[in-house]
Amino acid sequence: MKMKIIFLILILIFSINIIKCDKEFKMLTLLTAQVDDLGFNNMINQGRIEVAKGMNIEDSRLLVVEGFNETFKHLLPIVQNDDIDLVICSSSGHLQACRAIAEMYINSTTIKTQFLVRGSSSPTRNLIYISYNYASANYISGYFAALFSKTGKIGFVSPGQAANNNDSFVYAFWVGARQVNPDIKFYYYNIGNYLDVDKTVAATNDLLDMGCDVVGNTLDDFSTGDASIARGFPAIGTNGFPQRHVYGENVIYSYSYNWTKFFLPIAESVKSGNTNNSQWYADFDFDENKNFYHLDYGFEVNQSILDKMNTEIDYLKSTDRMSHPYYCNELIPQYAKENNLKLANVTGITLPIGCVTHQTFLSINKPFPGMTYLGNYKIKLVEVEFSQSLQYGFSITTGVLIAITIIMMLGIVRYKSTPSIRSASPIFLNFILAGGIIVYIGIIVWVGPANDHQCNARLWLVTLGFSTLIGSLVVKNFRIWLIFDNPELKSISITNYQLFPWVGACLVINIILMSILTSVGDLREIDAQGIDSLGKYEFMKVCKMNSSGASTLYTILAYFAALLLVGVFVSWKIRIVDIQEFNESKAIANTLYAISFCLFVIVPLMISPQDKQSETIVLCTAGLFITTAALLIIFTPKFWRVFTLGDGGTNDMFRKKQSNVATARAESSKSSSGPKLNRRGNLVSDDFTDTETSISEKKVNVVAGAVLAEFTDDTISEFDDNNIEQDNDNDNDNNNNNNNNNNNNNNNNNNNNNNNNNNNNNNNNNNNNNNNNNTNTSQPNDEKVEEKQQNDTEEEDKNQ
């Protein structure tokens, strides 16, 4: 009884050890991409899953790595720490790293990891090799492509040498097609990678455009098939995945790998502790348990094609691999001679004339006669241009505004003698308009195609235009301030020639700053990618400068801001001027305020990343708004007064006739003589009081002419000679009247002191009344004129 119990315990322990052993087997599979590529990596993963199912492996891992450095870096710690039993290095890109780690632990007693790698070298105690005849799969695929093609043109997309893959498999595809049709037209591209969707799709589309109706590939994914289906062409699956399971009848042919048939026996051998490793080989085989490839056809493939395909596959199965057509054909000898390749000479095997070994086959890279190599494919970058409609819109709008501005300049010349134009200085008005035209031209250049010259020209034009426009506005404001902010009413002469240097100084500062920007800013056109939601292979020509140029640009903006602040201050100082022809402060201030407001929008836009096309739209719109608003605000009132008032102004000082008061004084004061001076010794008329606190609107024309001359150029602002003579006569009459009144007052003073005091008081009262009348020159009314005439008459009666 005891023996039975012991026996049962031993059986239980043995069973537990077996179960424990099964659970502890660990397998790691290396991939070059994710399993959703519907290609090579997906099929490797399918083999891993089937092995885990068949052997009840709980710890079956995946690791996506590529290349020696990445593979070695991530794999070594796992091997050292996780007690992995089997590492499947699925890609040739994993080969070197896996071999290096296997070499490190080949004699280790603690790390017993086995490595399954791609290749056909001699195995070791911890290194297992597996290879599959990829050439036969490509050969039979090319055979099918030539059978199915209706145009006699087929294409191919290959990784090429850039991916450490020669074009021997491209050659195998072409050999299969040539077996069917010796005159087949064959075109192929290299894309430099096993997995590059963008290049694959673009290269496939190019091949389809050339007339190829069947396109194969040796890539890891199905991008070639996707591109063909999208264009309405049938696709073939040549990357080892059963594409028809996904795409149905859009795929007319595909072959798939069955890695389970090889991974499973290898894993079982490793689990059993076998270290006497061997080399494994996968290909077409009559033994279904060893047949690596499975072919699937669409309904469009007729029976004749199927029969030919089956016949050719049976030929490959029954023939020694070294005698297959891609190893042996009549083109090999000449090709080997031209490219220094050795012909096959295998001991114990009788080969046809003109064969190469598998190693020599793998070194085939240059195309054979009949193969058209299109080169390493480079995706053509597509330029995204600035919207043509917006270009036309801005250009046409700006052109119309330029035409209107030119008409305004002609209007300035035509109506230069009218008070509204004459009082504002026609020369400066044309400067302002010229600045506007320069800005408009800069905007047209701004929306045009970008190049180095355009990048520099647009900034030069816009900044010079604004300097001319704003500088002229500020200088005009400054002159108005100096003349009207004159409490002593001294005669101040500020000619245009005195103001030109100030406008020139504004331009010189602008030119210096722009010269610095041009010289050190490296302002040039570049092909920019990754902006404005552009596609991966789209670009836009944009202007770019370095940090020095950006700093200079900010300095230019600061200069404009300072100029605007000066203009705003001066326009505020002259807000009290009541004569409309001279009072441009409101118009200029409104212009400067509009510009300042726009700068608050422009400056943040210039210093923050924005959509380039939107940035151009905002900047050009702001430029048009600023310039057009400035010109309309300044010139619309002037031309309106020209067309409504003609040669007359809004103030009587512009009318070349005397007021009623001046006429009455001229008639009653002819006996007076001598000039009349105020307390400061300045020449004044009877309409000015001794306090000199205001300018009378109802003045004699000599004063009006004198004030006007301070604002305008002598050649265009003086009255004609006849009017000047008339004004001088009126002045003389007024002076005579004043002298006569003074003489009469003196006589009255000598006769009676009391009367004299009364008269003086009356005269003072009258003078005060006159002063009160004169202080309201900008708003004359009939009641004040009549009251002033009555006071003048009473004064003359008393003096008599």
Swiss-Prot record:
It comes from Dictyostelium discoideum. Residues 658-694, 718-800 are annotated as: Disordered. Residues 718-732 have a biased composition (Acidic residues). Induction: Down-regulated by phagocytic stimuli. It is found in: Membrane. This is Metabotropic glutamate receptor-like protein C. InterPro entries: GPCR_3_C (IPR017978), mGluR/GABA-B-like (IPR051530), PnrA-like (IPR003760). It comes from the Eukaryota. Keywords: G-protein coupled receptor, Glycoprotein, Membrane, Receptor, Signal, Transducer, Transmembrane, Transmembrane helix.
